[in-house]
Amino acid sequence: MKEKKFVSAVAYLYNDEDSVLEFLKSLDGYLFEKFEHYEIILVNDRSTDRTVGIIDENKKLLNSESVIILNLAWRHGLEPAMLAGTEMSIGDYVFEFDSTAIDYTFETLNEIYDKAANGFDIVGAYPDGPQKTTSKLFYAFLKKVSYLNLELTTENLKIVSRRALNRVLDLREKTRYRKALYRYSGFPCASVKYTPVKTAARAKRSLSERVSLAADVIFAFSDLGMKISIILSTLFFMLSLGIGFYAIVIYLTLKTVVTGWTTLSLFLSCGFSGIFLVLGILGKYLTMLLTEVQNRPSYIVRSVERINKND
């Protein structure tokens, strides 16, 4: 018997012409067999290949009559793109696929859905095996400095309940990092480990994208930036005081001192001490102000296409 719950599946697309057809057929087949009602939302992050064309050419192979392609105006990246897709979704549960690469089985999808239906609002799935060194270091560092000691890992897919998704969508965070935001939602979370059935080539971010995302996440979900500012301000303040004290000692102990040296040193010492203290205070207020006033949209949609297999 099919499940009565309405589910949405949101998938990220970017230059996936080699894998999108297999992914879409597999996903559609699974949802058709498992649920009475479902929708598939494909977020096209300004692909430059034939990703969308392949979907349109093979639409008659699909069972669903509710396949939506969300075309973004320019390349936004994974997190803003998935935000666009999840905001459009209407399902009681929402599957999120960060890639069209398939290295899991339907059993994995069943397992995360069953956990979600039995009390866990956010359930992620991650492959068994060693993580990339860079990812491992990033997650360990984020756990150390984040507000809630976030324990994150590389998740390839997840399912989220409607109430958890609504809470996360209501957050005013401009840095949208779903893994952290779901943990901050306060709802029960769980993870499922699966054994990859094959090696799947996953979409790769450029180095600059990864570094930018890592920096945004660390500074958005911790007070590391403020701590660094305060520590540096304090160090330079103490250094300036030390130089001022040294200038006074030199003036009192040496018989001959270069004219104006003491006055200049004291002036620079006091001046820079004040500047560094003020910079530390301003840094705090600027951080707070920027968080409040930056109200730019997280994504821009160019068009929405509804794929109808009967057309």
Task: Please tell me what each predicted stretch does.
Residues 1-29:
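N-proximal low-complexity "stem/linker" segments adjacent to membrane-targeting elements
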Residues 19-21, 49-58:
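Acidic helix N-cap motif at the loop->helix transition within catalytic regions
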Residues 36-47, 70-71:
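Short beta-strand/loop segment that forms part of the nucleotide-sugar
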Residues 44-52, 101-102:
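A conserved acidic beta->alpha catalytic loop
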Residues 72-89, 107-111:
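Glycine-rich, basic loop-to-helix element that forms the pyrophosphate-binding segment
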Residues 94:
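Short aromatic/hydrophobic "clamp" motif used to bind/position activated sugar donors
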Residues 107-122:
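Conserved donor-nucleotide/metal-binding helix-loop-beta segment in metal-dependent transferases, i.e.
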Residues 163-224:
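Catalytic donor/gating beta->alpha subdomain of glycosyltransferases that bind UDP-sugars
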